């Protein structure tokens, strides 16, 4: 709940391009944490794959214009995004470090219950400053989507992935988010497919492939 809440809060103060660039640091932070906690060793393929995937993300979110990244202005929202990076990396690393004696779905139930308790004070705080929810059809459709997919399906798959291949290799797949977003924008909003989309996709997919290789 901390990760999701802080992401939504940070986006009020920073650009999407800044947020995505900061989130691209999650695999690097996870590699550092898993090494410090002696959970998983890092190899040269993972480091090179991480570098390639970050280049690919930069290509997509900057529309192939490096000037957009060079002249970015960072702000308080970006600092909050760094909090997201730390919390998600720590969460992913601890999932591998501690073997929970409950099923994946039971663990998700515990997380959701704890998350609700954490979010209640935030709800009343926002209400106190005049932010109100509109309980209309759109609200309930969005709520259904968030509960069924990001809150249950995604967390289940994420936990299962870390259990099988470990945090270092799992977090590399986060780099696919900008690529999937670009593909969905092309399909749903009829945005034009550009060369930088192709270049970014090649770099990201190559980076993920390399990160899953093992040294001999």
Segments (PLM) and residue ranges:
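Membrane-interface helix termini and inter-helical loops of multi-pass transporters
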Residues: 9-12, 61-74, 124-138, 142, ...
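Hydrophobic transmembrane alpha-helices of multi-pass small-molecule transport proteins
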Residues: 42-64, 175, 184, 196-215
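Hydrophobic/aromatic residues within transmembrane alpha-helices
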Residues: 10, 36-38, 42, 98, ...
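Specific transmembrane alpha-helical segments of multi-pass solute transporters/efflux pumps
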Residues: 1-18, 22-23, 59, 147-165
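Residues that define the loop-to-transmembrane-helix transition and helix capping
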Residues: 17, 43, 103-104, 168, ...
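Alpha-helical transmembrane segments of compact multi-pass small-molecule transporters, enriched
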Residues: 22-36, 51, 112, 116-117, ...
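Hydrophobic/small/kink-forming positions within alpha-helical transmembrane segments
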Residues: 1, 5, 27-32, 86-89, ...
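Hydrophobic alpha-helical transmembrane segments of multi-pass integral membrane proteins
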Residues: 47-55, 76-83, 91-149, 176, ...
